Amino acid sequence: GAYFDGFDVPCVPRRDDC
């Protein structure tokens, strides 16, 4: 979903681009 630190995560409160 949102690329954070090279990982594809759904929605994180740290770096989210939903």
Curated annotation (Swiss-Prot):
Record-level Gene Ontology MF annotations: toxin activity
Tissue: Expressed by the venom duct.
Compartments, record wording: Secreted
Protein keywords: Disulfide bond, Secreted, Toxin
GO CC annotation: extracellular region
Comment text on domains: The cysteine framework is C-C.
Protein name (record): Conotoxin AusB
